[in-house]
Structure formats: structure tokens, C-alpha cells
Amino acid sequence: MTIKVGDKLPDGTLYEMGEEGPKPVSVAELIKGKRVVFFGLPGAFTPTCSALHVPGYVAQADQIKAKGVDEIVCVSVNDAFVMGAWGKDQKVGDKVRMLGDGSGLWTKVLGLELDLIAKGLGLRCERFSMLVENGVVKSLNVEAPGKFEVSDAATMLQQLDKR
């Protein structure tokens, strides 16, 4: 079952690269009492993700946060080492938090698992964006396969303007 607007965002453990290696991040703790924008994508260092998706959120992070968003989080089915290296490559700084769902378990719980086995990429995350307020999904934008039209930073900004 896929997560939908009005649902409570399920807890899970994601990982980010810290000074001493990967460190766990509880989704429940991350969103508690906060307004958080999540965006998920199929993979680090892939063309659309690297050329458009992440750079869009980095470029518009200040505008998004000015709308009352506490944090912007990028999630991918990659490990913390890859997400950390990709964050440096994308120059995210403190604008976007790069969290890995290495096992894909949280992605699966959300119902946003993308099967790319036939393309040699394994099980990944669908491309999406989501606004979560105090643990509840307020907006959710899931892309059609192969598309990049509704999960971008500009769309999220428009949705934040309406809230």
C-alpha cells in the first residue's frame, strides 16, 4: 500500500555520513514537531537525479525554508557512503540533508519501491516529493515512470505557497 496524503509517516532508520562513518537517523525523530520536505529518487550519480533533481532543491532551499520548512531531505536507496560523496559532489552543504536507505526497507514501507532489476539497478526508490508536518503527509507528488514533472523543487514551492 502506497503512502498517501493524510497518512502518518512511518518510522524507519535512514543513514547519513558522519565524521566517524555512517550514523543512523530515526525518521520519527527527524520529523517530530517539524515541517520537513522529503524528495526521493532512483539513485545517486544518475543523470536526472544529478543534473536536475538535487540541484533544483539546493538552488531553491532558501526559498523553501523561508516558507516555514525546517529541513529538506533527499532519500535514495544507496548507502551513507555514496550519499555523503554525492552530497559533496552536488555541493549541498547544509541546504539538503542526504540520507541513505541502503536496504530499501523504508522505501518499501512507503510503497514507493521501484523495480529496476531488468535494467541492472536493483530495487530503488520512485522519484517523489513530499511535505510532512508534525508527522503527517500534507502533500505527495509521485512521478510516472521515467518522468520528472511533479517532484521538483519548483512544484514544491508552489504547493507551499498554497498552504
Walk through the language-model features, giving the residues of each.
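Chalcogenol-based redox active-site neighborhoods
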Residues: 1-163
